[in-house]
């Protein structure tokens, strides 16, 4: 039985920080957004959680839809819940981290006009609060 709430609901999204080794350190996978908000800006692969999927399944689906990459093992990194982090409204993002092999092939699709690997030391300007997300991810992987 469905229940209708009388108060506004938050939106739930997932993002994937995917890292691969490179000659000069690590690289992170980013997509160029095809649609507003932040059309044409670089961002982490991610999107909205469907009602019939788990958070990790949503992260894997969004990663595959936007980059063609399959990463079996994703680990929850952090929940980002800043009140004004998304211009579309109140949005909570659960971020996952995973690793890809050096020769991993990617191909932009769905909401991404392109996808590419970037050195942590040469990141483009990022959409949303993804600079903070990557700062946290970099600290996490340096502690391994």
Walk through the language-model features, giving the residues of each.
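N-terminal strand-loop-strand
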Residues: 1-43, 56, 71
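Unchanged
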Residues: 49-73, 78-141
């Amino acid at each position: 039985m469905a229940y209708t709430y009388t108060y506004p609901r938050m939106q739930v999204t997932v993002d994937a920080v995917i890292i691969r080794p490179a000659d000069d350190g690590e690289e992170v996978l980013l997509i160029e957004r095809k649609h507003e908000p932040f059309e044409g800006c670089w961002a982490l692969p991610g999107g909205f959680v469907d009602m019939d999927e788990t958070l990790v399944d949503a992260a894997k689906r969004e990663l595959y839809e936007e980059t063609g990459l399959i990463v079996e093992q994703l680990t929850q990194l952090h929940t980002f819940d800043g009140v004004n982090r998304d211009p579309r409204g109140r949005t909570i993002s659960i971020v996952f981290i995973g690793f890809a092999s050096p020769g991993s092939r990617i191909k932009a699709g769905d909401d991404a006009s392109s996808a590419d690997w970037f050195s942590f030391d040469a990141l483009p300007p990022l959409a949303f609060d993804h600079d903070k997300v990557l700062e946290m991810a970099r600290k996490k992987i340096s502690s391994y």
